[in-house]
Design a protein with these regions (language model features):
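Internal, conserved structured core segments that host functional sites
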Residues: 101-145
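A short aromatic-anchored loop/beta-hairpin motif
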Residues: 2-116
Length: 145
């Protein structure tokens, strides 16, 4: 839950870690983690109400000295898993990126002298499967290290 505003200081947005495991998570609606993720999605979209979400994905790696920032605004999803039934490769996740948010993150990283590469990549299952279960409909910006 977001903290209260303290004088002139901005409200801090909470940080969430979402580890979903394999893509079969999105069909295992009876699993307690599925209900928890749906609850987190509800909290974020109805209480926190961010303009966008910044996502750090472990499914991509860049060089040790740079962070890759996804500046794409519409991404295909990547089926970065193997050996699942055919219907798992037919899931769709409509999404919207935010170039504006990406550029703000790039600006902050640059001010800290952190090198950045702008890339356009699809969404890996660690993002789209979790966002589907959480029913999130927010702009996002994805980075890779």
């Amino acid at each position: 839950m977001a903290s209260e505003t303290n004088g002139d200081l901005p409200t801090r947005t909470p940080v969430y870690f979402l580890g979903i495991g394999g893509p079969n998570f999105i069909e295992n609606t009876k699993h307690p983690a599925y209900a928890q993720l749906a609850s987190i999605g509800h909290e974020i979209t109805t209480k926190v109400k961010p303009k966008a979400v910044v996502v750090f994905s472990a499914h991509w790696q860049s060089s040790p000295n740079k962070i890759e920032i996804n500046v794409g605004e519409q991404m295909d999803i990547i089926y970065d898993f193997y050996g699942f039934p055919a219907h798992f490769y037919e899931h769709k996740y409509p999404n919207k990126g935010s170039r504006e948010v990406a550029e703000k993150v790039i600006e902050k990283l640059g001010a800290a002298r952190i090198e950045v590469d702008r890339v356009e990549r699809g969404l890996d299952h660690g993002v789209w499967a979790g966002f589907m279960a959480g029913r999130w409909d927010l702009p996002w910006m994805m980075s890779f290290f």
